[in-house]
Amino acid sequence: MALAAALTACSSSGSPSGGGQSASADPKDATGTVTVWLMDDAQKNWPDLVQRVNDEFAAKYPKANLKLVYQGWADKVGKLDKALADGNAPDVVELGNTETMKYVLSGALAPVDRTTFDNSDSWIKALANTCTYQDKLWCVPYYAGARVAIYNSAAFQQATGSPDFPKTEGDLLAALDKISDKNKSDRTFSPLYLPGPYWYAAMSYVAAYGGSIAKFDSSGNWHGTLHDAKSQQGISHFADLVRKYNKGDLTQNEQNQYEAMARGHAASFYGNGYEAASVVAPGTGDASLKDSVKVATMPGPDGKPLPTFIGGSDLAVTAKSPSVALAADWVRMFTSTKSEQALADKDILPNNLNQLNPLKNKPTTAAAANAVPDAWFTPLAPGWGAVEKQKIIPDMLAAILKGKSVDQATKDADAAIDQLINSPS
């Protein structure tokens, strides 16, 4: 549930963008309330950045107010849809980059001026694309996410004689087998903790085999392609890994997968680079693992690194906000060079290449930072939001792990995707 805090407002310098209320010529005379919905990742991992930005906004706009509300991923979309329908939407909302197109197409977001935001000329292209429609910018990239292998080097050392994560999948599977044998007395120990509904991972294997979730055809429509042979290969490969190496509850999703390692139940898992910090953080994990938990590139089945989903978040100003200029200025501040550097310093991938490039040579971020150029993304289709909301792909994976054939499960999933993907959700 969200944590609400009434705070004096915050923002950085730059020209106001969008419509609605405009900031006063003298910022100290500007009034209004800016309600911001941020995901609880910020509350858990970079609350100091949030506080600094809010303090700066308060200093610039002393007569304005900020209401900050932290949201959880599980129910944010439902809450936002209701808030928009009821006419009480936030002024600023954080959107996962697979969620943005739904709200762009529904007219829920206000356009913003790209030129007024720091580093906009070097934004990561895949992130900027999620905010762009008909040559207008409807949101601002916030941070990127690329998935990597997170592993306990001590567990690998004990079982294989090497603390290093294997560079090829063949070597990785051999190492996982040795780890499994070493820990066979513990039936809850997973050499590779790979959650069954983890569709971001499953689709990475689909991408590795040359498959895709959906394609845009010559008639101008999207259609599901999970039933294609290459996609089926990737899905089968993923399911085989889950069955063999995940000794936990196969129905559990990846939201708190770091806990398996923190509790001593996993030697490795596939996640966002920042999840390694959660494994060893005193509040969420086991600090004694600090020297053992490492990150590495996840090898794929084709002799190359496993293609990663380019995850991340965007920040948008809602179209009916009475404080559009103030809201856009808060976003400008929160995505400034200074703010993005604060994220980079915490091993979070910033929204632009200028600040991303140094992370390619940093041991704790190299695997994720170098994965960004070859990353894949979900279809930028009108109804993709509905496909996600209906959990079509996680449900397909669950059915396969319960015994449904890959052929039938993918055929059914494509049919469900086809019903939704071309209609704005």
Feature locations, PLM:
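Extracytoplasmic "Venus flytrap"/periplasmic binding protein-like
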Residues: 56-123, 132, 157-160, 264-268, ...
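Hinge/lid segment of periplasmic solute-binding proteins
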Residues: 97-146, 205-208, 290-296, 361
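Conserved N-terminal structural module of periplasmic/extracytoplasmic solute-binding proteins
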Residues: 1-102, 250, 302, 325, ...
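Extracytoplasmic/periplasmic substrate-recognition and gating elements
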Residues: 55, 59, 157-159, 236, ...
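Glycine-centered hinge/linker elements that transmit conformational signals in sensory
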Residues: 176-177, 220-250
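Long, aromatic- and glycine/proline-rich binding clefts that accommodate carbohydrate-like moieties
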Residues: 126, 130-131, 293-297, 343-391, ...
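A structural signal for short loop-to-beta-strand junctions that line the ligand-binding cleft
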Residues: 90-91, 119-155, 190, 304-307, ...
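Extracytoplasmic/periplasmic solute-binding protein
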Residues: 138-142, 147, 171-223, 266
